[in-house]
Amino acid sequence: MTNYLLEIGLEEIPAHLVTPSINQLAERMEAFLNENRLKFDKIIKFSTPRRLALIVEGLSESSEAIDEEVKGPSAKIAKDAEGNWSKAIQGFSRGQGATPDDLILKGDYYYAKKHVDGVKAEEILSKVGDEVIAKMTFSTYMKWGNNDFLFVRPIQWIVSLLEDEIVAFDLLDVTANRFSRGHRFLANVEIELKNANDYASKMPENFVLVDAEHRKAEISAQILALASENNWQVTLHKDLLEEVNNIVEYPTAFVGSFDPKYLSVPAEVLVTSMRDNQRYFEVYNQEGQLAPNFISVRNGNAEHIENVVLGNEKVLVARLEDAEFFWKEDQKLKIEDLVAKLGKVTFHAKIGSITEHMARTKLIAAKLADIAGLTDEEKVDVARSAEIYKFDLLTGMVGEFDELQGVMGEKYALLAGENANVAAAIREHYMPTSADGQLPETKVGSVLAAADKIDSVLSFFNVGLIPSGSNDPYALRRAVQGLIRIIEKMNWHFDLSLFIDQFEGQNHAEILEFVKARVQKLLLEKLDRYDIVEAAINSSNFDITNMMESAFVIDGHKLHEPFKPAIENVSRSINLVKKAADIAEINPALFEEDTEQALYDAVISLQNQWTYKPCEEKFRAIVHTLAPAIEAFFDNVMVMAEDLAVRDNRIALLSEVVALTSVMADFSLINTK
């Protein structure tokens, strides 16, 4: 067993592409080795902004020898009319190094038995350039030199070592060898690697921490140590830590500061300037107040660190000066003046202005406020917030820091005298900003956020701007997923079709299928029964909360003894009703059996209270009240009676069963086998 090292040296890779790139390289290497039957124990990944590297441990010296059968021509064309081997069979056998007489007939085809010898690891690995590296794909490419080769960034060097032997191959004008390179500034020299096993220990000696997880742990430890020394609190934000880790090869954390006068600017602005724009970690005192300091990480050692600190402070102060200016100037603006100007700001060229979008959102929000049971005072707040909630788009601060949309709206609204509910709704209407992001906390904010998302989705669908495949430029999938999460959290019950009707020419089915797909995705992240999820999302009305609750309730009963017969009896009813051309009115006078009357009575008793029953109670009623009555009905009644009036009456009775149960789910889609 041997170890193999592959290192691809590159120009600086964008931070967000480093981790996906090394993961892809490892996956492609694993697939390549498996395809070539070259066994190994594990693949260890290394990555920095300038290199992607792998060590394959426990590699076999050669690939596995195998005996295989190769499928050839069919028996129908194997011989000619005289019984001689055909040209097709002769050509096939020749290609396999055999004679026609060596072939084996299995069923309708001839097969050649073939022994495939093992291939030396060196020979297989010499194809890594073409079969692994050249086949990598990226969201962003670069082209260099006079060729058509594309890669994430230009390749500068390649190391390819099987233990202490070079496995040579060429990729463009780069020949794989044993020479890596150190840190760009601290050790900008070639580093000779005598053995693949030297990599992890040799590179840190040249100021390159190639192990990304070790480097991240080192960054975390340094930041926490500096925070502790200064009695600060600091949060190691996951995404920021990942980004910083992927822009340095040899990290050294340091402390910087800024004038406390800038603390008069809202903390969110300062944090955005530091964290999002400069990749700094903000720090807080022990009372949880933002301190006029930050922690950052340089790509180098502590030499001349004071110059690095001054440079970073200077860059930050420039941004804080802008922030302070906008904060003061924006407070001179009036909300009503900014709202008036939104009529000239385009929401989308095919849809209209932001003012028009807000007007539609206000109408939707009013309906939602009724559905949500808001108080009259809350409804006033919903209306007011819907009238102004986009005003901060025209402030200087949001123009400079667009990440602060909504956040600044809340602050400026409070300064202008708007009440807390209205101000909070302005901030919360963007929520959630990610798949698992925070949801609005207030009722008014929840209504506004949902209404804004409903109008956005319906508006884009109305003009034909519909997501296809992975293409979703207007983030409509995210909007719908956020809408679903808000509706579920607030436990709102309403049919989404109510809001689609306000748009002329809407393709209702297309929109509902789009939303249904998002509900399905969310449910399948939590439940393992696809059929139960399908049944729930195909209920007779488009009540998202009902769909979600139904799926969980049905799934919770799937192992109970009455589950199977109950589902089968309801499904039988559904299938019979589906076959009926027309459904008549029920006439109890046509009942001939007691079980018909009993089923009718069960349906009527449930109908009177069905709308307001929770899903759990609905399902228990279906299992324990309705299903036994259906079973008795089927045991004692011939549904397809010769008397057409009696037959139609029985189908009509079953249609009422279906109407009742389908409010919860389409039970015919559940597999009981």
From Swiss-Prot:
EC number in record: 6.1.1.14
Gene Ontology annotations for the cellular component aspect, listed alphabetically: cytosol
SUPFAM superfamilies (alphabetical): HD-domain/PDEase-like
Biological-process GO terms, alphabetical: glycyl-tRNA aminoacylation
Pfam families per record: tRNA_synt_2f
Domain of life: Bacteria
Alphabetically ordered keywords of this record: Aminoacyl-tRNA synthetase, ATP-binding, Cytoplasm, Ligase, Nucleotide-binding, Protein biosynthesis
Catalyzed reactions: tRNA(Gly) + glycine + ATP = glycyl-tRNA(Gly) + AMP + diphosphate
GO MF, any single term: glycine-tRNA ligase activity
Cell compartment(s), UniProt: Cytoplasm
Family from the record: Belongs to the class-II aminoacyl-tRNA synthetase family.
HAMAP family in alphabetical order: Gly_tRNA_synth_beta
Assembly description: Tetramer of two alpha and two beta subunits.
Name of the protein in question: Glycine--tRNA ligase beta subunit
Species the sequence originates in: Lactococcus lactis subsp. cremoris (strain SK11)
Gene encoding the protein: glyS
